[in-house]
Amino acid sequence: MEKIISKLNGCLGWELRAATMYSHYAAYVKGIHRLQLKTHFEAEATESHGHADIVRAAIVKLDGKAVTERDSTKIVHTTNYEIMLEEAMKTEQRAAESYQEVLNMIKDDDEMYDALEQIFFDEARSVEELKRLS
């Protein structure tokens, strides 16, 4: 159980980092694509907060202690939308990989599996969307 809680806490910290990164990028994006990407980054920040809530609930369900701080991986500060999209791709790919690992660990809990599988699908969709934006 501790291994699952630890992995979920990793996902939670990553979602908190993603929310911070996307909010930061929405504020700083410049250039001809600013309006489209500002909206995109704001939506991703909101999605990350929602994912964090679901992951936190899963940790509570397992009687674990949820982290309150974001993952410490550096957030690249830039106003260049191309770099922002590259960083977003790295973030979404890592998130999808992490959720895939968790899904392999929780196959016996249908409710939790379904909730986290939906997040995995959201992350995979984000990767595909970023491929089209890049």
Where is each model-derived feature located?
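Iron-associated oxidoreductase/ferritin-like identity signal
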Residues: 1-134
